[in-house]
Amino acid sequence: MGLCYSVDRTTGKEPGEASSTATTAETVEERSGSGRWRRPRDLKGGGDIEGIPQVLGRLVSNGSSKIACLYTQQGKKGTNQDAMLVFENFCSRDDTVFCGVFDGHGPFGHMVAKKVRDTLPFTLLTQLKMTSESDQSSLVGANGFQIKCTEEEEVQTTESEQVQKTESVTTMDEQWCELNPNVNNDELPEMYLPLKHAMLKSCQQIDKELKMHPTIDCFCSGTTSVTLIKQGEDLVVGNIGDSRAVLATRDEDNALLAVQLTIDLKPDLPGESARIQKCKGRVFALQDEPEVARVWLPNSDSPGLAMARAFGDFCLKDYGLISVPDINYRRLTERDQFIILASDGVWDVLSNKEAVDIVASAPSRSTAARALVDTAVRSWRIKYPTSKNDDCTVVCLFLQDSSVAMEVSTNVKKDSPKEESIESVTNSTSKEEDEIVPVKDEKIPESCGIESKMMTMTLAECISVAQDDEEWSALEGLTRVNSLLSIPRFLSGELRSTSWRKWL
């Protein structure tokens, strides 16, 4: 409620309205000593910020804006553990936007995902502000990442942050060099290095706060995180876990292409596996799912985590699991159309190209994310009819104005060869309504007709269809039942919480 209170202050409400806000604050104050209700705190990235959804330009539920749309749908495994975020005018800059998708797992995965979603942007703002104060020259320039904190984003540095501010960042720098040996700093804009350091520090701080959180048990619960910050034509993407970011761009022939911006950080990747084994963790796949490598404790067949990096999951943090993001930079061009951020519930059943084509062929920008989620859900029923589909979450960030996209779409239609137009006769009706026309040589009818097929196909036919489909590579998605197989049983109750929180 702290942020709600500051928003009311700046908007100049009537006295009657202000009194209602004060009453709400008093109510929270009275409940601060019980259960999950806690005293409102400042926006340092570590507290429960009740009023965050009221920040202008911040979207966390199904909806859309002029430049983005987002949609999530609960799977058949229980509570929806996915979270998403679109934060426009980030850092109070009109040309800057922050987007993220967070896929939780474990008993409290939904709480961890929402916690990271709510705290990461403001923690990043805090770290950027600290960097700007300590080294302003590194942030100001032609492409500088200048920070202008509004009253809602103003952060007061606490004693714990003062301690972290004096800590050396040598360890993170070494990790960065090991993870990105081929990065040439001369080719990067001035805003990149400060932002990279701020992202590394923010993830480290959030993981520490999760470990000490009084109401969220993160011992065997965690979340992935795929985030992006777009400032002008500069794009910075950070990835922890197996959620994914994909860019839709056009080649010289105006054909729509899918470019994967992140790597699915699976335990069987050579670098990830080497680090885990060096820390005495184990990496192997079970016999009934040989294609899914998992992380296991040294002396216990648990928890079986299907990713090499994650927030939380402190039972594995001493055995190779890390929360260091894989950060990449890309300079956007006029050929780039949109970016898709999605959880693995989408990528397990759809390839990058299929996802790009579905978004491009959506009736409108506001329905693009939902169209992709709906197609993913139907694909789960077709490909794996006996499995429970996972939560599916999509964030679409559009890089071009709708008028520009329509013009490009028209040019593609005029320049398309005759032989390619024959293959696209079945899609001619939908193309007239599209803002961005998909590639002509891609076969879309299968995804478009899934719902009608489901009405007539028997279970045996569905299984045969799934078996006839081509195999999926590691980049296109893996089929698995759960991100976390089992929970290790050591101590119970307060004894366990006291034990693992001493690992700081």
Curated annotation (Swiss-Prot):
Keywords from the UniProt entry: Hydrolase, Magnesium, Manganese, Metal-binding, Protein phosphatase
Listed cofactors: Mg(2+); Mn(2+)
Enzyme class: hydrolase
Region (Disordered): 1-49, 410-435
Pfam families per UniProt: PP2C
Coiled-coil spans in chain: none
Substrates-to-products reaction catalysed: O-phospho-L-seryl-[protein] + H2O = L-seryl-[protein] + phosphate; O-phospho-L-threonyl-[protein] + H2O = L-threonyl-[protein] + phosphate
Gene Ontology MF term list: metal ion binding; protein serine/threonine phosphatase activity
Listed EC numbers: 3.1.3.16
PROSITE patterns: PPM_2 (PS51746)
Residues in PPM-type phosphatase domain copies: 67-399
Descriptive protein name: Probable protein phosphatase 2C 18
